[in-house]
Regions:
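Catalytic Walker B motif of ABC-type/P-loop ATPase nucleotide-binding domains
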Residues: 183-186, 442-445
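Conserved ABC ATPase "signature" region
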Residues: 137-154, 391-412
Length: 523
């Protein structure tokens, strides 16, 4: 299957048994989501060859579809289920027979919470029950579905106020309202911390068992395959490279990722950022005075990769924004060294804070690239960097090489649009977009939030290489201790707005509480 010149899937041959839980494992951009959308059958694909054949049982009287084992049984309308085949490639998108099958397939889309944000949780599920039953509303049915996904305790909450994991479970409850014969789960826990992901996985596992569903789940986390599937597929560049027992497929995927060399001790310079008794307080209607950062004193050295770690709400993002000059402190002092001069970051103006911030860069977790402009445009004109073309091309290639592309890869990437790149490639281009402005201090906010293992290793190498090649100082905000251990020279552990320890990543790890370990260490 192609999108323009890009071949998203090729030579995919796969059979899925009724009642089976199949996992599709692969790095970002390997074609997992595309394959799931093809199997769902509700979108037209212009350049697709081959067949996608469903073997089901269908009632000729009312067109209701059930799994193939129901053939010969009586339908609720009084008819009898007959064996039936539907090929989603040959049947048109609006063909009634194709729609009969596709409406019996539920899907949880990657990073998409299809909820009515202003409605209560129970109303969201009641609406799904109404849609599935053709107009009949059942409060009890909706409540049962919330029980199924362990969300009864949030029944009266407004949907937009739920956490990511809670929203994902409400989405699952809405899909279960269809009483589906198959569930397609596309990275259902890809953006969640390990503890929350476990809750979502348990809800999925329970629903599959209770509803006797066939399930296909995609992930870039090997452990998900082992926990939730009977059989797994390893997908790479749109091709199936291996099928088999989940633990073996997970092992092959980990082997593909390779590893980062042991962190080397690096000579760093003198302090470049210094803060003393730094505090930031907010006023909250329901919580009163919130001490987001509470009397923090800290030094970061030039050329150092320094980690700010802690659970959600510990204060690390607020602290990083103050150190970067984005947020002003309530009290305390921050200074940044420019050359031999110390600049007071609490004094506004081009001769004070502005003198330091022009040498700072920040890559946000939710970074954006201009999707319809080439990579070289994203690295130059789009960010206000006006250079003669030859110099712009040379500087762009040099920066792309710094973040991990080979020179040949960099030359090819320059003319592509971001949507032609994998997630890992886009992340490296976004990092190059920050580095090409020649900052002295770079803040990375949750740089590995949704990354697969292979992409995470690519980005780890990019950070280490950028420090070695360009002499940058990195401040990394993260709750991913695996990543912090791979790249950081030192780290500060934050808890309730305070720094409780500064030292090596291993030293920080030894002082973490059980709750911190559950959120910050991979499962």
């Amino acid at each position: 299957m192609k999108f323009g010149e890009v071949e998203a899937l090729r030579h995919v041959n796969l059979e899925i048994e009724e009642g089976e839980s199949l996992g599709i494992l692969g790095r970002s951009g390997s074609g997992k989501s595309v394959l799931l959308h093809v199997l769902r059958g509700v979108e037209p694909f212009e350049e697709i060859t081959g067949s996608v054949i469903y073997h089901v049982a269908r009632c000729p009287q009312c067109s209701h579809v059930e799994p193939p084992s129901r053939a010969g049984e009586s339908c609720r309308c009084g008819g009898t289920f007959q064996p039936f085949e539907a090929d989603f490639v040959s049947l048109g998108i609006n063909d009634p027979k194709r729609r009969d099958v596709s409406r019996r397939i539920a899907i949880m889309l990657q990073r998409t919470f299809a909820l009515y944000g202003d409605e209560r949780v129970i109303v969201n599920v009641m609406r799904a029950v109404e849609e599935a039953s053709g107009g009949s509303i059942s409060v009890n049915r909706a409540a049962d579905l919330l029980d199924e996904v362990n969300m009864s305790h949030r029944m009266m909450h407004v949907a937009r106020e739920l956490s990511g994991g809670e929203k994902q479970r409400v989405v699952l409850a809405r899909q279960l309202a269809k009483s589906p014969m198959m569930l397609l789960a596309d990275e259902p826990s890809g953006t969640l911390d390990p503890k929350t992901a476990d809750l979502v996985h348990e809800s999925i596992r329970r629903a599959v068992d209770d509803f006797n569903m066939t399930m296909i789940i995609t992930s870039h986390w090997p452990d998900v395959m082992v926990e939730l599937t009977d059989r797994a597929v390893l997908l790479d560049h749109g091709e199936i490279v291996s099928i088999g027992e989940p633990s073996k497929i997970a092992g092959k995927f980990v082997a593909m990722a390779g590893k980062i060399e042991d962190r080397k001790k690096t000579d760093v310079g003198s302090p470049i950022i210094r803060c003393k008794d730094l505090s930031k307080r907010y006023i909250s209607i329901d919580r009163g005075v919130v001490r987001a950062v509470d009397e923090v004193s800290l030094e970061v050295y030039e050329g150092e990769i320094f980690g700010l770690v802690g659970t959600s709400g510990a204060g690390k993002t607020t602290l990083s924004k103050m150190l970067n000059g984005i947020v002003m402190p309530t009290s305390g002092g921050i200074w940044c060294r420019v050359g031999d001069d110390w600049v007071d970051m609490t004094i506004l103006g081009a001769d004070h804070k502005g003198r330091a911030t022009k040498y700072m860069g920040m890559l946000h977790q939710e970074y954006t690239l201009y999707p319809y402009r080439s990579v070289i445009d994203n690295l130059t004109e789009s960010i206000g960097l006006s250079l003669p073309f030859e110099l712009a091309e040379r500087k762009a290639i040099h920066t792309l090489v710094t973040v991990g592309f080979s020179e040949e890869e960099a030359e090819k990437v320059l003319t592509k649009n971001p949507n032609e790149l994998s997630e890992g490639e886009r992340h490296r281009v976004a990092m190059a977009q920050v580095l090409i402005k020649e900052p002295r201090i770079v803040v990375l906010d949750e740089p590995t939030g949704t990354m697969d293992l292979i992409t995470k290793i690519d980005v780890s190498k990019s950070v280490l290489n950028a420090r070695d090649e360009l002499g940058e100082t990195f401040l990394i905000v993260s709750h991913d201790m695996d990543f912090v251990q791979n790249v950081c020279d030192r780290a500060a552990l934050m808890r309730n707005g305070k720094i409780v320890h500064v030292g090596t990543p291993e030293g920080v790890l030894s002082l973490m509480t059980k709750e911190e370990e559950e959120e910050m260490l991979g499962s």
